Amino acid sequence: MRPRRFTANGPLKGRIGVPGDKSISHRSIMLGALAVGETRVTGLLEGEDVLSTAAAMRAMGATIERDADGMWHVHGVGVGGLLQPQQALDMGNSGTSTRLLMGLVATHPITATFVGDASLSKRPMGRVIDPLSTMGAEFTASPGGRLPLTLRGISPAVPIEYRLPVASAQVKSAVLLAGLNTPGVTTVIEPIPTRDHSERMLRGFGAELTVDVAADGARVIRVRGEAELKPQDIAVPGDPSSAAFFVVAALLVEGSDLVVENVGLNPTRAALFDVLRLMGGSIEELNRREVGGEPVADLRVRHSLLTGIDVDPAVVPSMVDEFPVLFVAAALAKGRTVTTGLEELRVKESDRISAMRAALELAGATVTETEDGLIIDGTGGDPLPGTAEGASVVTHLDHRIAMSMAIAGIASRNGVEVDDTRPIATSFPVFESLLESATRP
């Protein structure tokens, strides 16, 4: 355990950059490893989750190296060229690595065992096992479809048409990646749109992929298999999920005026910023541009008094990871914020609904937990009291709980004690040092 008390340290000023987008980092390594030739990646997020993906692709034959300037070089094996790994693939804490790599392995004639840490081993994999089994892959999983899990891939696999029963970019991506080495056309039908990095990047690497909208509004995504992917040069934009912590911090701490540079604003990911604007947050987009098919801008954020709202459940897929820090913003808003439709948060790295209710209550917020969300009565802009001496927030090995409550701490009177800051390294290794530099006078 590495506990830490986060305390008010003055306004956030100046300009900061956040690390590369986690979703794009994972996919650039995976698709680079399936292309023929060298893919070069700058701005890669070097957190533990992405490094788990890189280690797994190395174990299956790709050559992946980082040079002294921080550029990553990926020499791929070609679609269909993945090799049998010699030992279990350790996914650490990364649900994304696990589910997407299961898709890749499922349609190669290899067998792989996936293992993970205590938190990942509690997360259900059944939603990925179901469609991949239909394609012909075989699974031996721990009870409840959990890790450790052994997957026996099949080639040639059977192309399927799969309608997602629950909005999940990871399940969608797993099936599309499985489709790359499957003869014919693999189809995913998505009733509610989720983040579309996989579609954008598959096209960018040269896969034949189409997206149509059905009569009922569902997205119909088709990928033609036995593709030949071409290597790419990728500049990874800053991660909006990481930027979220600093955007909320600057809104809450009086006197703040902060620019967060190079933030990816993919519309399937950036709903938090729209919700915060609806609450009265001053968030301005400067220097809007497009990098590698992804919209990017610098965000200028100024301290604002937020007002509570009813958050439309339709935005959930576009900000599913940002709710913990939105709860912190709501705790200091004027009036009541109501969130619904958040069942998915109960099966993240922790049960984020109950974990954040307990954490915010400990810090002095007024919170009611419901089946599918939280109802938060804000302080009207006053700082939270903070946690009492000897009391610390339980993060449940969840990086987003730890970082959200760190932000609550810098917007509190007495500070917030977080029981363990180590999980932060999974997605944002420089979070604490960046927070210190933003609040340094």
From Swiss-Prot:
Compartments where located: Cytoplasm
Residues the record lists as binding phosphoenolpyruvate: 22, 95, 123, 170, 352, 400
Superkingdom classification of source: Bacteria
Catalyzed reaction equations: 3-phosphoshikimate + phosphoenolpyruvate = 5-O-(1-carboxyvinyl)-3-phosphoshikimate + phosphate
GO CC terms of this entry: cytoplasm
A GO biological process held by the record: amino acid biosynthetic process
Annotated binding of 3-phosphoshikimate, by residue: 22-23, 27, 168, 170, 321, 348
Enzyme class of the recorded protein, top EC level: transferase
Biological pathway: Metabolic intermediate biosynthesis; chorismate biosynthesis; chorismate from D-erythrose 4-phosphate and phosphoenolpyruvate: step 6/7
Keyword annotations of the record: Amino-acid biosynthesis, Aromatic amino acid biosynthesis, Cytoplasm, Transferase
GO molecular function, one term: 3-phosphoshikimate 1-carboxyvinyltransferase activity
Signal sequence range: none
EC number: 2.5.1.19
Active site positions: 321 (proton acceptor)
HAMAP family according to UniProt: EPSP_synth
Function, as annotated: Catalyzes the transfer of the enolpyruvyl moiety of phosphoenolpyruvate (PEP) to the 5-hydroxyl of shikimate-3-phosphate (S3P) to produce enolpyruvyl shikimate-3-phosphate and inorganic phosphate.
Family: Belongs to the EPSP synthase family.
Assembly description: Monomer.
PANTHER family: AROM/DEHYDROQUINATE SYNTHASE, PENTAFUNCTIONAL AROM POLYPEPTIDE
UniProt-recorded name of the protein: 3-phosphoshikimate 1-carboxyvinyltransferase
Protein's organism: Novosphingobium aromaticivorans (strain ATCC 700278 / DSM 12444 / CCUG 56034 / CIP 105152 / NBRC 16084 / F199)
Top-level taxonomy: Bacteria, Pseudomonadati, Pseudomonadota, Alphaproteobacteria, Sphingomonadales
